[in-house]
């Protein structure tokens, strides 16, 4: 028998906190949880409060809460008024001066939800890093989640920072996001932006890869169980492979002439395509924040202006964008006092 004699190490406060945070429990907390849980709770709570009770009458001239008659698709937490610029709109700041009713009226809840939501999604990414390290696996889940973080931060924070105020960010609501998409198309011709094209290719390509991969795995399952369906035929502790990569490779080689030769390259490609799509679209939004133009085919515009018989899909889309601008601007930005001919102005429900 060996007896080790030594001095007991003193455990500091940091070690005690570290042990408590990383204790095995139903919901892991961790150091990342100190950022994630409070921020996520406040962001979701602020959003639910806003769509339930808070009006957008003072910032947008709109009804935006359940209390005013909106439903889940039309309710939103609206952006602050344009006159507020890029102020953080703190409850105790010079705008609200501690008056929570005034803070709701000027749109302070939007900055509250946007900032806490941003830190919340960053905390969730850090949580995946932390747990991956503790479990002993690679951190590719966290790397993949960097895509949604990039999109959220660029759309809700970077884009309005490049514009005149928070007013031009999307409000937190379904119909409000649709309005923002129309705004991006009308004022930035977003659908013709190559970064948007790469983003769409990445997201739809990722969905296609998921569908193909799932179907291929189902098609090549080893029949080593007697149960009637997939979910009962295998045990989670089985040591053998679930499906045949060799058979899958042979199938797709016959379909396309080429196929993935190993699982590592296959799954890395499935990771890369959608994440690259999200990152490229985020880069495109940064360009919009700086009002950079993407594709402007001026030669076609000039020829269409000179020749009434010459028209392309590009020139037709340009006319649609002009219509969006003239229809949206007067209603969406009443503080600018835009004046348009009466025949092109929106006519409410009489359309």
Curated annotation (Swiss-Prot):
Record carries keyword Ion transport: no
Membrane topology: Multi-pass membrane protein
Transmembrane region(s): 39-59, 123-139, 151-164, 206-226, 277-293
Described function: Photosystem II (PSII) is a light-driven water:plastoquinone oxidoreductase that uses light energy to abstract electrons from H(2)O, generating O(2) and a proton gradient subsequently used for ATP formation. It consists of a core antenna complex that captures photons, and an electron transfer chain that converts photonic excitation into a charge separation. The D1/D2 (PsbA/PsbD) reaction center heterodimer binds P680, the primary electron donor of PSII as well as several subsequent electron acceptors. D2 is needed for assembly of a stable PSII complex.
CDD domains: Photosystem-II_D2
EC number: 1.10.3.9
Binding-site residues for Fe cation, renumbered to this chain: 213, 267
Primary residence: plastid
GO biological process: photosynthetic electron transport in photosystem II
GO MF entry, a single one: oxidoreductase activity
Extra facts: 2 of the reaction center chlorophylls (ChlD1 and ChlD2) are entirely coordinated by water.
GO cellular component, one term: chloroplast thylakoid membrane
Subunit (UniProt): PSII is composed of 1 copy each of membrane proteins PsbA, PsbB, PsbC, PsbD, PsbE, PsbF, PsbH, PsbI, PsbJ, PsbK, PsbL, PsbM, PsbT, PsbX, PsbY, PsbZ, Psb30/Ycf12, at least 3 peripheral proteins of the oxygen-evolving complex and a large number of cofactors. It forms dimeric complexes.
SUPFAM superfamilies xrefs: Bacterial photosystem II reaction centre, L and M subunits
Sites where the protein binds chlorophyll a ChlzD2: 116
PANTHER family referenced in this protein's UniProt entry, alphabetically: PHOTOSYSTEM II D2 PROTEIN, PHOTOSYSTEM II PROTEIN D1
Subcellular location: Plastid, Chloroplast thylakoid membrane
Cofactor annotation comment: The D1/D2 heterodimer binds P680, chlorophylls that are the primary electron donor of PSII, and subsequent electron acceptors. It shares a non-heme iron and each subunit binds pheophytin, quinone, additional chlorophylls, carotenoids and lipids. There is also a Cl(-1) ion associated with D1 and D2, which is required for oxygen evolution. The PSII complex binds additional chlorophylls, carotenoids and specific lipids.
Binding of pheophytin a, residues: 128, 141
UniProt xrefs under PROSITE patterns: REACTION_CENTER (PS00244)
Annotated binding of chlorophyll a PD2, by residue: 196
The gene coding this protein: psbD
Electron transport as UniProt keyword: yes
Protein's name according to its UniProt entry: Photosystem II D2 protein
Record lineage: Eukaryota, Haptista, Haptophyta, Prymnesiophyceae, Isochrysidales
Pfam families: Photo_RC
Organism: Emiliania huxleyi
